[in-house]
Structure formats: structure tokens, C-alpha cells
């Protein structure tokens, strides 16, 4: 599985995720604006953090 791993609005980069079945994108807002984090897996998130998990290559941009 290949997942995007760039932060927020940086140039898209990807990572090969051995043994993973999901990519994720999570985002939240703070004093800097909207922060977006992407990567492999499907993590648990705190209340107030939005999470989208998906199962296709590069589906988390």
C-alpha cells in the first residue's frame, strides 16, 4: 500500500506501508489554521480531530 505522508499543504510525497491496509488523513484547527497530517494505518484520534481512513493507494491526499 502506498500512502501520502506530507503535512498540510506541502508538496505531495508518498511512503510505502508494508503490512498496512489503510492510509489516513487527520486534520484539526488551531491558532496556525488547519493542520493536516497524513500517513499509514488508521490511528485513534482525540475528540475534535477529524479522521478519514481509506484502503487504496494514495487515497489520503
From Swiss-Prot:
Transmembrane segments: none annotated. Disulfide bonds join 3-23, 17-40, 42-53, 54-59. InterPro entries: Snake_3FTx, Snake_toxin-like_sf, Snake_toxin_con_site, Toxin_cobra-type. One of its GO terms (cellular component) is extracellular region. One of its GO terms (molecular function) is ion channel regulator activity. The record marks 56 as: May be the main cause for the toxicity difference between this toxin and cobrotoxin-c. PROSITE patterns: SNAKE_TOXIN (PS00272). It is found in: Secreted. Keywords: Disulfide bond, Ion channel impairing toxin, Neurotoxin, Postsynaptic neurotoxin, Secreted, Toxin. Pfam families: Toxin_cobra-type (PF21947). Expressed by the venom gland. Belongs to the three-finger toxin family. Short-chain subfamily. Type I alpha-neurotoxin sub-subfamily. It inhibits muscle contraction with an IC(50) of 0.23 ug/ml. Produces peripheral paralysis by blocking neuromuscular transmission at the postsynaptic site. Binds to the nicotinic acetylcholine receptor. This is Cobrotoxin-b. It comes from Naja kaouthia.
Amino acid at each position: 500500500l502506498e500512502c501520502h505522508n506530507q503535512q498540510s499543504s506541502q508538496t505531495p510525497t508518498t511512503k510505502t506501508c508494508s503490512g498496512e491496509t489503510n492510509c489516513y488523513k487527520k486534520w484539526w484547527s488551531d491558532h496556525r489554521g488547519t493542520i493536516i497530517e497524513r500517513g499509514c494505518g488508521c490511528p485513534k484520534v482525540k475528540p475534535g480531530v477529524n479522521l478519514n481512513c481509506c484502503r487504496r493507494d494514495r487515497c489520503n491526499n
